[in-house]
Amino acid sequence: MLLAIDCGNTNTVFAIHDGTDFVAVWRTATEHQRTADQYYVWLQSLMQMQKIEVEITEVIISSTVPRVVFNLRVLCDRYFNCRPLVVGKPGCALPVDVRVDAGTQVGPDRLVNTVAGFTQFGGDLIVVDFGTATTFDVVDVDGAYVGGVIAPGVNLSLEALHNAAAALPHVDISMPDTVVGTNTVACMQSGVFWGYVGLVREICAQIKAERARPMRVIATGGLAPLFSQGAELFDAWVDDLTMQGLVTINSYNREA
């Protein structure tokens, strides 16, 4: 079976795919110091708890944190006896073209989202991923990745407010009941929520105007459901878009 690993700046997601569907999906904090042995013990304990008995024969990794990749490679070699595909590295081909100035600098998660978006929805697409950063990736009519936009992430903005202004508390993002807040927490939540609604709407509008044709907007990432409420920003929301993209890329390389 396939083990797909999506390592982001904040969280790392592990998913087992049986060729048809995901058998299990687990999320853990991204830690630079975690060893291959620790990863294996953690995975084995979760598999035993859920009574999952499978043999991992393939692994594919997307990582925006280069320091973590080494230990994940050791995990694959030591415990699964396989060499992983690593998106963005030699030996991992993509089923789409990358038409930007410096293709090697594009985050692998953005390329994976491009593949998944094109596979599910076709071209002329904007993929918005609400992660540590909020990214907008533009997929051409033929599926090629042609660039995008990177904005500060929602939680990053809240943390910046808290860290830079001594009087402002740490708050969690939520959809406010009203735009005008009547206390500090409500004011901060409203500013960040409606500020990001405006950011997403305007960036997508500018991309569509620049491309001069209709484009669908697809959302993914942990906070995408929140921004799908109360504001008509997206044509679709796909919770596991990145993991689906990893499965597609793995299949493409297996058949190549």
UniProtKB/Swiss-Prot annotation:
Positions bound to K(+): 129
Pfam family name, one: Pan_kinase
Cofactor: NH4(+); K(+)
Catalytic activity: (R)-pantothenate + ATP = (R)-4'-phosphopantothenate + ADP + H(+)
Cystine pairings recorded for this chain: none
Locations listed in the record: Cytoplasm
SUPFAM superfamilies in alphabetical order: Actin-like ATPase domain
Catalytic residue list: 109 (proton acceptor)
GO cellular component, one term: cytoplasm
Binding note for cofactor: A monovalent cation. Ammonium or potassium.
Residues where substrate binds: 107-110, 184
Pathway: Cofactor biosynthesis; coenzyme A biosynthesis; CoA from (R)-pantothenate: step 1/5
GO molecular function (one): ATP binding
Binding-site positions, ATP: 6-13, 132
Sorted UniProt keywords: ATP-binding, Coenzyme A biosynthesis, Cytoplasm, Kinase, Metal-binding, Nucleotide-binding, Potassium, Transferase
Gene Ontology process terms (BP): coenzyme A biosynthetic process
EC number annotated for this UniProt entry: 2.7.1.33
This protein's record includes keyword Transferase: yes
InterPro entries the UniProt entry points to: ATPase_NBD, Type_III_PanK
Main location: cytoplasm
Function: Catalyzes the phosphorylation of pantothenate (Pan), the first step in CoA biosynthesis.
Subunit and partners: Homodimer.
Family: Belongs to the type III pantothenate kinase family.
Name the UniProt record assigns to this protein: Type III pantothenate kinase
Gene encoding the protein: coaX
